[in-house]
From Swiss-Prot:
Residue intervals annotated with topology Cytoplasmic: 1351-1393
UniProt name for this protein: Polarized growth protein RAX2
Organism lineage: Eukaryota, Fungi, Dikarya, Ascomycota, Saccharomycotina
Function: Required for establishing sites of emergence of yeast and hyphal daughters and for maintaining the linearity of hyphal growth, but not involved in responses that require a reorientation of the direction of already established hyphal growth (tropisms). Does not play a role in penetration or injury of human epithelial cells.
Residues carrying sugar: 62, 85, 105, 125, 133, 139, 164, 186, 195, 212, 256, 260, 266, 269, 362, 398, 405, 479, 536, 542, 565, 599, 646, 649, 653, 674, 689, 696, 702, 714, 747, 764, 768, 792, 829, 863, 899, 935, 946, 958, 985, 1020, 1030, 1041, 1213, 1232, 1262, 1323
Length: 1393
């Protein structure tokens, strides 16, 4: 029992841990294990020098995603944080999204965006919706807004197609996202709703707003009814603010109200419902007799709107005829509409023939002269254009009287006349207008061909301006081309009949069996076949639907015929009937599908439809079934309504109703409860742009908010709707409208034209509308009086905060009547007279943030918490300013500026941040830092920021002293300085003496001799010493006397004037000779390409290529050198040559023989080599282990062969390696020992990308795999206008990765001296330690001189004025002939001295 209890307890603990893990999901932050290092062997620390603002250990996978790639367009010594040559105030920066773990302060960048994020809202613990002016998200083309799922990193697009504009604002309401802006969607404007669960976007029920409208803000007022069910609590109203004056469904704004006044003249537009359907003649065959026009013109007149005409030959009768397509033959038309041309010519008498019965049709029509029904057959009259329009004009004058007949409808605007001529069903009507007359067919005759014969004409020829046929049945063909409208321009109309093949392949029966004539239909043999037919049922009423099935005898398919399932679906997707139909009928047949009521549908998204799908075959075992689809016919039995009516402002129809409009100007209240059972048919009945307003049209209320909207001018614009917290009584709530306002009403006046402050009294749950107190006072002045404060400019944005709100923008706020009534948050709430750009309003008091005015329109705000500190971030036009709201002060350190526009906390442990740059780097320091015991610290070097500086080189001298160099400045030091290793935090010391550096001079290499007496500096430009000596190439500094030596080497240069470089120096201790390598070819006047030896003892340059018994020549650029024997140096570089032989990667120089050679095994490396490290102390034969890096490679040498070890490095155009070292592990490891011992690990520094990890500046290699170690950051800043005062935000920045140029350690493997191989005691002599320590600590040359006065004579008695005692010249040297070049060189030296 106890065991079972223990097992159960362990299970519960596991479940609890699992739940906690889910709650604090750190799956995004996978830790990276770092090896433990022994810092004692590296001088107790690892120095990192370069170009950066901050550093972090690479603690988790993708740690460095918060930094961007470096800007390769900027020079390595032109810092990205110093790109300040732009004065633009609209500089655009890319934005990013960051996931931050609040608990561990980890940050992960998971998205790059090519624009600004303006809104960011949490949808769930795993998803957010973001909106802004971006079109690309992680290089994926998108339309804003989008939904981003964090765990899967998937983007859900709300809009998949172009919306011809942009979404300016979004509002999240549970499962719905309201979208507002200036866009077009689904033929509606400026508003839409996205359902998060269904993943579908829809038009709003009110069909958005009018063309050229714009929605800038959306908010919600809850109904506040505590007694309603929980699911009803979220109703209330949605408020839309922007610039608009109508709704997309504008009839919602017209109320049909009862009126006692029945004598006012009715100016309504009336329209009879035309339920009859236009028969498509588009694919008919057109012929004519005695036609003057072409057959093309004969076909074109079936689309009268194209303004084409068909003319008979002059002074001659003629015939125009159309033969229907085979599948349409036998149709029963109900009327023809004949269009009359303008001008003197036209048809006076005509007759209509029908085929195949070849008979003259009996016709009935409305005689325009009497407006009575008339009949004709062989001699039917048409009026000419002028006479017809006289009658139409007369109708306009007598419209009121004519419309008293309920079966007659006269349009009061254009005088068109219609009446029903089937009083029982009222499904057919007849009429005329200014350019046509209609003629109904008395007999119900099936026709294959219809012809119009011209008997008499007006003028000198008969002309047809158009011809249309109608029927009172709705026929949908399976062959969708037969559903095409007569006019191509109507092809996209939602009211067209159409057929959609859902699955399967359908063909014309005539294409399968050409012998079949006089009929055509679709055939398929696919067993998954399905087709849907959409009849144009535009009006609600009773319909009878039948389906026609062709007989199998026509095509001989009886044995193969199929069984089909036919389903009738209503416009609300309800299944109305289902039929199983056997298709093996020999002759044509029809089946009843449905009889009953159908709702009229106006769009393809809510249409009645008939679905036909394959079920099986009548005969079992048939392998090639034969499913046929011909047509479906919906016959109109009766309609619910028979007329439409539309009216303008305050007019009356004949039944005593008045149409009262609701006026909108930039503000609209959308009641969710009112629209919960919305049906557009309860708004109006619409046909041919003529509208009748329903008495039930009460969806949009004339609420006090809509009333306020109507009383604003039509130039008003609302930029923001802001709702304050509810007041103590629980009902009243503040409503702030920000924008540009004027009032057109005498009933409402405004105290300013920027902000309207309202109070929501309550929400009326009966009328489903918001009750507000309307403003009623006018004060117009240049300044804006808002809540007791005077603003000299408009507020751009309001931000709701708990118990208060913020106003931000390009303004200055002063106290009422200039008083000091404003409190300064940055100065213990002391009274001040003004606030600039940002102001907080709380408890009837305005507060300032203590900043000076900045000429910038701040329009973005976000607040977030970092390291338990709340920050406010204000931004606009690329400028950011960060306020520490816990300590009430501005953040002035640029490295701590939060360039964020949005923040959203998604759970207790994580938040999403959006902006141009964000950093939670672990350690802030400019260009220098060191690691000791696994933590960052920094040297006593205060490099001046915002300059193009970089520390590029370093040299560890001994336990007391290190030297750094580059191109940098501190308060007292320039380009080179001395660091105390015993106290690294102590202030850096400068070199003593007068020194003037050239503008572009850079310390490229450093070396201190084995006796720690001389500091050799390799420089690429001029240096003036002690106001008289100009040096380029090598500068020598006396560390003992703390002064520049009085002897300095002749300058290094290029004979063609090109810049030089001094990349490496090594010292041959025995001969006291310094070997210098780089890119140059002259030392003074001495030819000395690539390599030159400086004889320290004799203070002269020697060309090593001419110093041997046999002259040798070398070429290329030397980049690195190291001793491998006490008298031999291994040299590498770019494009090295020896005696004209190219392709050499490594050279060997022997100081004893003054000769050059190569070792074949080393030169088998395929890549270029810039630097290398010898990883074995005993490597006399160069068969030890090595590692080398080049521009695009890192390779290891096992003593015999080279092998690439950089498979995990991704090479890009910015990839750069700068330095490498061997570090010591805290404990021996089981690492691969191919390239170094198991107690060591290799590190390389620069800037590069590691596979699976991302950007790094420093990585470790354990012999098998790479481990990211350190990455840095650097703010890229650009000027964006002037700013002053505390917290000045005149610069916008983006976080990029920095550079590590040099690793400073006590390096046992640098081998820059032949004595380095001896592993001698490197400690300074007692006198030197005391002297240098005091010099570094105190910087006092006077004290240094006093301390050295005694040991100087004892220890350095052979030195005078910095010179070594010259060695005796041997007799054999005196016997050699003097080289003229050397003689000239000696003359140069004496001249310089």
């Amino acid at each position: 029992m106890l065991v079972q209890f223990q097992q159960l307890l362990l299970l519960l603990i596991s479940i609890i841990k699992l739940c906690q893990a889910d709650d604090n999901d750190n799956s995004f932050f996978q830790p990276v294990s770092q090896p433990s290092l022994n810092y004692k062997d590296t001088g107790n620390r690892i120095g990192l020098l370069g170009s950066f603002d901050a550093l972090s250990f690479y603690s988790f996978v993708n740690s460095s995603q918060i930094v961007n790639d470096p800007d390769t367009s900027v020079s390595i010594f032109q810092k990205k944080r110093d790109v300040s040559n732009s004065s633009s105030s609209s500089t655009s920066f890319s934005n990013s999204l960051y996931l931050q773990d609040i608990t561990n302060n980890y940050s992960l960048k998971f998205a790059d965006i090519n624009g600004q994020v303006n809104q960011l809202f949490k949808i769930s613990n795993d998803s957010v919706v973001l909106n802004g002016n971006f079109t690309s998200f992680n290089n994926q083309s998108v339309i804003s807004p989008i939904i981003f799922t964090i765990s899967s990193r998937e983007v859900t697009k709300i809009f998949s197609d172009d919306i011809n504009g942009s979404v300016k604002t979004i509002f999240l309401d549970n499962d719905l996202i309201y979208l507002g802006g200036n866009f077009k969607f689904n033929n509606t404007y400026s508003a839409a709703v996205y359902n998060i669960t269904a993943k579908k976007v829809h038009s709003t029920p009110f069909q958005g707003f009018g063309p050229n409208s714009s929605i800038n803000s959306i908010a919600k007022v809850l109904n506040g009814d505590k007694e309603k069910e929980d699911n009803e609590e979220e109703l209330g109203s949605i408020l839309f603010g922007g610039q608009f004056d109508t709704l997309g469904l504008s009839d919602l704004l017209v109320h049909n109200i009862t009126s006692n006044n029945t004598k006012k003249h009715n100016t309504s537009n009336t329209s009879i419902i035309s339920a009859e359907q236009l028969i498509s003649l588009r694919h008919g065959t057109f012929t004519s007799v005695n036609g003057e026009s072409s057959e093309e013109d004969a076909a074109a007149i079936v689309c009268p709107s194209d303004n084409k005409e068909w003319a008979a030959q002059k002074n001659s009768g003629a015939e125009w005829k159309v033969e229907l397509p085979d599948e349409m033959k036998g149709i029963h038309p109900t009327k023809a509409r004949i269009y009359i041309p303008e001008g003197p010519n036209g048809i006076k008498l005509f007759r209509i023939y029908s085929y195949p019965n070849n008979g003259i049709m009996n016709l009935t029509y409305i005689d325009p002269a009497t407006n009575e029904l008339a009949y004709c057959d062989a001699w039917c009259p048409l009026l000419n254009y002028d006479d017809l329009n006289d009658h139409v004009d007369n109708n306009i004058l007598n419209a009121t009287e004519l419309n008293e007949n309920n079966s007659v409808f006269v349009d009061e605007q254009d005088g068109s006349y219609f009446q029903y001529y089937d009083p029982s069903t009222k499904t057919k009507n007849l009429g005329y207008a200014s350019n046509f007359q209609e003629f109904a067919f008395v007999d119900n005759v099936g026709v294959d061909t219809v012809g119009v014969t011209i008997i008499d004409w007006y003028g000198d020829q008969g002309i047809l301006a158009g011809f249309e046929l109608y029927q009172n049945a709705i026929t949908v063909y399976g062959n969708d081309s037969l559903n095409d409208p007569n006019c191509q321009s109507d092809a996209s109309d939602d009211t067209n009949n159409n057929a959609v093949i859902n699955s399967g392949s359908f063909k014309s029966v005539q294409s399968i069996n050409p012998a079949i004539t006089n009929t055509d239909y679709l055939v398929t043999s696919d067993t998954n076949a399905k087709i849907t037919l959409y009849p144009n049922i535009s009006y609600s009423g009773n319909y009878s639907i039948i389906m026609m099935t062709p007989g199998c005898a026509y095509d001989g398919s009886c044995a193969r015929r199929a069984i089909v399932n036919v389903t009738v679906v209503g416009d609300d997707n309800d299944v109305l009937s289902t039929k199983t139909i056997y298709q093996n009928n020999e002759n044509n047949k029809f089946d009843y599908l449905f009889y009953g009521h159908l709702n009229g549908s106006k769009t393809s998204t809510s249409s009645n439809r008939i679905e036909i799908s394959y079920m099986g075959t009548v005969t079992e075992g048939v392998q090639d079934p034969y499913m046929v689809v011909d047509k479906v016919i919906a016959n109109i039995v009766s309609l619910d309504n028979y007329y439409d009516k539309n009216s303008t402002n305050h007019t009356r129809n004949n039944t005593g109703y008045e149409l009262a409009p609701i006026k909108l100007n930039g503000l609209f209240e959308y009641s969710l409860a009112n629209f919960s059972q919305f049906d557009e048919q309860l708004v109006h009945y619409k046909r041919n742009n003529k509208t009748y307003i329903s008495l039930n049209n009460t969806f949009v209320g004339n609420s006090s908010i809509n009333l306020l909207s109507g009383e604003l001018s039509n130039q008003s614009r609302i930029d923001q709707i802001s709702l304050g917290p509810k007041q103590q009584d629980g009902n009243k709530q503040s409503l702030l409208l920000l924008g540009k306002f004027e009032s057109d009403s005498k009933n409402i006046t405004l105290s300013n034209n920027n902000l309207i402050t309202l109070t929501i009294d309550s929400y009326n749950n009966t009328l489903n509308e918001t009750n507000i107190e309307l403003p009623s006072r006018l004060t117009k002045r240049d300044t804006q009086t808002i809540l007791g404060g005077n603003f000299n400019n408009s507020i751009t944005r309001l931000i709701e905060l708990p118990g208060c709100f913020l106003a931000i923008g390009d303004f200055a706020l002063s106290g009422k009547d200039g008083s000091s009534s404003i409190k300064d948050l940055s100065n213990n709430n002391q009274s001040v007279s003004s606030a600039n750009n940002f102001a907080l309003y709380s408890d009837d008091q305005w507060y300032s943030f203590g900043n000076d005015y900045t000429s910038n329109d701040f329009n973005q705000f976000t607040n977030l918490t970092l390291d338990s500190v709340e920050y406010y971030v204000f931004s606009g036009n690329g400028q950011f300013r960060t306020w520490d709201n816990d300590n009430f002060k501005w953040v002035t350190d640029p490295t701590k500026q939060l360039n964020l526009t949005q923040a959203a906390q998604i759970n207790d442990h994580q938040q999403i941040l959006g902006g141009t740059g964000f950093s939670t780097m672990q350690f802030q320091s400019v260009d220098q830092a060191y690691i000791a015991d696994g933590n960052f610290s920094k040297f006593g070097i205060d490099v001046i920021a915002n300059k193009s500086f970089m520390i590029s080189n370093s040299y560890y001298v001994n336990s007391s002293l290190s030297v750094i160099g580059g191109k940098f400045e501190t308060k007292d030091v320039k380009n080179v300085g001395l660091i105390s290793n015993s106290d690294p935090n102590n202030t850096i010391s400068a070199l003593q003496g007068s020194i003037v550096w050239g503008d572009n001079t850079l310390i490229q290499s450093l070396y201190v001799d084995s006796s720690d007496e001389y500091l050799f500096m390799g420089v690429n430009g001029s240096v003036q010493i002690n106001e008289q000596t100009n040096v380029t190439g090598i500068v020598i500094y006396d560390l003992v006397n703390n002064t520049f030596t009085s002897f300095q080497p002749a300058e290094l240069s290029h004979s063609n004037g090109d810049p030089i470089s001094v990349n490496s120096m090594v010292l041959f201790d025995k001969g006291n000779k310094l070997l210098v390598g780089g890119d140059f070819d002259l030392a003074g006047s001495l030819s000395c390409p690539s390599l030159c030896v400086y004889d320290i003892t004799n203070t002269r340059w020697i060309n090593p290529q001419n110093d041997a018994t046999t002259t040798q020549s070398i070429g290329g650029v030397v980049t690195d050198m190291k001793f491998f024997q006490s008298n031999q140096v291994l040299i590498t570089g770019n494009g090295l040559q020896l005696n004209g032989n190219s392709g050499i990667k490594f050279l060997i120089y022997n100081f004893n023989s003054n000769s050059f050679s190569v070792k074949d095994s080393l030169n088998k490396i395929d890549q270029t080599v810039e630097k290398f490290i010898l990883n074995d102390e005993n490597n006399k034969n160069l068969d030890g282990r090595m590692i080398a890096f080049g521009e695009k490679s890192i390779s290891g040498f096992d003593g015999s062969n080279w092998q690439r070890i950089d498979s995990d490095i991704i090479y890009e155009n910015f990839t750069k390696f700068n330095d490498m070292k061997l570090l010591t592990l805290d404990k021996p490891s089981d690492y691969n020992q191919t390239y170094f011992d198991k107690s060591q690990i290799f590190t390389i520094a620069g800037v590069f990308r590691l596979k699976d990890y991302g950007l790094v500046n420093m990585a470790l290699f354990n012999g098998t795999s790479w481990i990211p170690y350190v990455f840095t950051s650097l703010q890229q800043q650009k000027s964006t206008g002037s700013g002053s005062g505390s917290g000045s935000g005149s610069r916008s920045s983006s976080l990029q990765i920095g550079q590590i140029q040099s690793i400073l350690i006590d390096d046992s493997y640098r081998f820059q001296s032949s004595d380095d191989l001896k592993k001698t005691n490197k400690n300074l002599s007692r006198g030197k330690v005391v002297g240098i320590s005091l010099a570094c600590a105190l910087g006092s040359t006077t004290l240094l001189g006093l301390l050295y006065i005694i040991p100087y004579f004892a220890l350095f008695k052979n030195r005078k004025d910095g010179y070594f005692q010259p060695e005796r010249i041997h007799e054999d040297e005196m016997m050699d002939a003097v080289n003229p070049e050397d003689l000239l060189h000696e003359i140069d030296l004496q001249r310089e001295k």
